[in-house]
């Protein structure tokens, strides 16, 4: 089993995928989704399929969360903030920041970068 159990009831189910059938499934069933494309025309097309499937299933498309992903790279914090802004403009409700390719040598460097990103993006700790 899962321990400790998540506090959310029911447990949120998030889907990822990059095909029309996957997008339709997300619209029918998912609490959230992980797009496999960046903001732009392809994301807009995917979102339209998710939204249409949600409506067809009697669901509110705006209730389906979306997580955008940004990577900390040579552009550093400025790039993270720029890319997160693009995801927000595209409707992302969540942003994941990946520091694994940043070239950091220690865990503390990753934590410092994520702390800086959280501050720059206006993220507050959960309560």
Which residues are covered by each model-predicted region?
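Active-site-adjacent structural elements that line small-molecule/cofactor binding pockets in enzymes
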Residues: 1-127
């Amino acid at each position: 089993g899962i321990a400790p159990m998540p506090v959310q009831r029911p447990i949120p189910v998030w889907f990822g995928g990059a095909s029309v059938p996957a997008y339709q499934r997300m619209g029918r069933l998912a609490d959230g989704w992980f797009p496999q494309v960046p903001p732009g025309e392809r994301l807009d097309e995917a979102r339209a399929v998710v939204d249409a499937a949600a409506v067809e299933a009697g669901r509110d498309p705006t209730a389906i969360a979306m997580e955008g992903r940004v990577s900390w790279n040579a552009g550093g914090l400025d790039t993270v903030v720029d890319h997160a802004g693009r995801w927000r403009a595209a409707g992302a409700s969540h942003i994941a920041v990946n520091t694994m390719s940043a070239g950091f040598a220690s865990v503390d460097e990753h934590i410092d970068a994520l702390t800086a990103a959280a501050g720059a993006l206006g993220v507050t700790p959960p309560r």
